[in-house]
Amino acid sequence: SFSRLCAEVGVLTPREVVVDLADPDCVPPTSADELGMEFPLVAKAAIGADYDRISFPGKRKIWFIDDAAELAGMWRSLKEAGYCSTFLVQECIPGDDTAMRSVTAYMDSTGELRLIGSARVLLQDHAPTMIGNPVAMITEAFPDLWEATGRLLRHAGYRGFANLDIKVDPRDGRELFFEVNPRIGRNSFYLTAAGANPMAVMLKDLVLDQRDEPIEVTRQVLYSLVPDGVIARYVSDEALRRRAKGLGRGIDPLRDPAERSLRRRVTI
């Protein structure tokens, strides 16, 4: 599992309990004593593809659970929807969206870290099925996170793109790795915006059999899918608001001068 691999190389993760709902004898835990963790808690599917196959009223990408009754209700909804896979219940780490970090890496076909970059999240989407997806970020170098990411991916024998979500615990400054997505992230354009096209790196490796020196993305840019006013209103950290404003207009991958469609422009 992800948490086991992290533990083997000294990478920190939140405490968690894995619940296998595919086991017909499984009785999902509902109390703090059963879980060994206090409420509030966070719950999510271990395998996103399995979760995407089901649909039910009130479905959420990530569940924030305040008490045993809410947890029991979640298990009931999953059972009624026919969900038969693993689910994770984790301790809830405090802190707002700005405590999140995104790391994108490419491990080439020889197993070496060929590209890495990262961003500080300003805002995330808060729609129930989209929660956790960043909508505004500042690209920034985080060498400690890069080193830990490389250590983890090499240990796993990983190849290809990986996108990792990390949160800094405001209580003690620990950097906790939440998950690794075994693909390039939906917001990976922040790398291109900062000067490193991940597709070019992949094509050189897999098509041309060429590997340049490893690329570390250090340029700072504002990557944003929302109007500047949204950042100004909802980012509570004044210093971060000033940083975002100082970087100028945000780079939005949806805005392309080559796209002439009036309908498209109105839509976005």
Per-region residue spans from a language model:
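Peripheral (often C-terminal) accessory segments that flank ATP-dependent C-N-forming ligase machineries
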Residues: A200-I268
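Flexible, glycine/charged-enriched surface loops at secondary-structure junctions
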Residues: L88-V89, R159-N163, D212-R219
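Gly/Ser/Thr-rich active-site loops/lids in small-molecule metabolic enzymes
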Residues: F64, A68, R186-K204
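Active-site nucleotide/adenylate-binding loops and adjacent lid/helix of ATP-dependent enzymes
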Residues: F2-F87, S109-G111
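Glycine-rich phosphate/pyrophosphate-binding beta-alpha loops
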Residues: L122-P134, N181-G195
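Phosphate-binding site of ATP-dependent enzymes
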Residues: I65-A127, E140-A148, V168-L176
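Conserved metal-phosphate-binding beta-hairpin within the catalytic cores
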Residues: L153-F189
